[in-house]
Structures are given as structure tokens and as C-alpha cells.
């Protein structure tokens, strides 16, 4: 599942490999990551990078309190899509934001409602629209 997601991603197309983020020999971080997840992301997608986060601060980009789970890059760009018997979360590896509209159409978990389980996809769509009208992916167009 994760491998299939990954080979269709822009990361794969740009030569990023599994080992760019993961260490097969194990680390102190979850999922055998080489560094904390958001630190890995910011290595390439920092504030001065043309590829993101497109806001002065992470909190402004995510609309979640700084240092909260919702402000982590993987919360939106690698949402949890399954859980194994060993209580291991399986995350999407397309690195694309799955909008609530995509969730409705494709019947896949979206980045908002994976955490906001008490809310509807309509609530999530309205929240995204209130954040910006500049980015079509945020409003699911």
C-alpha cells in the first residue's frame, strides 16, 4: 500500500528514496525516521523553499497551534489511512493533501477528518474555504 502510493508521488519523481527519510537499522524516532518528521520535511520544504510551506510560520500554514499534532507536516500530507494489528499507523505516502471533497468522491480518508473525527466533511470543507481562496486543493476543486 505505502509503496504503491509512493511510486506515484512527486517525491519519487524527484529521486527521493525511502532511505532519505527512513533508516532500516532503526532510530529513536517513530517509523524508523532519521529525524522527527517535520524536521525531515523542512530539510527540503523550508520557509525559503519554492516548494512550501507558503506561509511565514508553520502555524499560519496549518491553521493549528504551533507544536501541536495538527501542525506537523505529516498530519495533512501523510494522513493515517489504516492501522495494523500491532497498533502501527499506516500513513499515505503520496504526500498530497487529501481534501474533504476527494474523500467524498473517492471514499478515502481525508487529512482533516482523520483527526477531527467528530466533524463532517462539510465542516472540513467550510474550514478550508475560510482559510484561503487562493489554493484550489484547499477547497477541493
State what each model feature region is:
Residues 135-141:
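Extended alpha-helical interface modules used as scaffolds for assembling large macromolecular complexes
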